[in-house]
Amino acid sequence: GGTGETWETAATVPGQKTAIALAYSPSDSLNPFQVTTEYNYYLIPLVYEGLFRINDQFQAENLLCESYSNEGNQWEFQIKQGVLFHDGQELTARDVVYSIQQAQSSTCFAVRSQNIASCTASGRYTLRIRLNSADSRLPLLLTMPIVQRNTGAEDHPPGTGRYVVEDVDGTVTLRANESWHGGRVPITEIRLSALYQD
């Protein structure tokens, strides 16, 4: 073994600025509902989160969802309180409704949401979903990104994830989200290296 320090070990030093670079396509969007390239698609989970994530055993784990219950094709979800979007606004059930509606018309996520007949916010943190047909696997499908409502036309709408998109004169960087609900982010900066394709 060499004596060189990997970025994983360097990232554990408190207060140390640690950066890595990842490829992305500048001609494509970082909006999770408009993304078309594989490069940018793989960046989405760094910036956005779903109600659930899929663990190593391919099971749904709560992420932005606090708890849920269902009876037949009717589901109710309690959204985690105190989760902030990158612009400081709090996540609510209305943002989740908006995001599911965006997903239903998105190339990437339409298949996951095609069984959803209706989706409504019945309180600030309560989401109700009615399915066309009962499906116990619904949490596995609700991994689609949640964005702030009414931001669907933006190139990178506010998310709740570990990184915030910073675009300065065409140079795009992902910076650690200092108010991320999951705690401290070890890698403070991800520089996006543009791939120019013909």
Whereabouts are the PLM-identified features?
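Short, solvent-exposed loop/turn elements at domain surfaces
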Residues: 27-35, 59-61, 86, 137-140, ...
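A structural signal for short hydrophobic beta-strand segments in well-ordered beta-sheet cores
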Residues: 67-68, 118-120, 163-165
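Gly/Pro-rich hinge or "lid" segments in bacterial periplasmic/extracellular proteins
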Residues: 130, 134-197
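Short, low-complexity disordered leader/linker segments with a strong preference
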Residues: 1-16
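Short, well-ordered beta-strand elements
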Residues: 15-26, 74-77, 96-99, 127-129, ...
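Residue-level recognition of beta-strand termini and adjacent short loop/turns
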Residues: 121-125
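Aromatic- and charge-enriched surface segment that lines or borders ligand/interaction sites
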Residues: 66-107
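N-terminal lobe/hinge region of extracytoplasmic solute-binding protein
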Residues: 22-70, 78, 101, 113
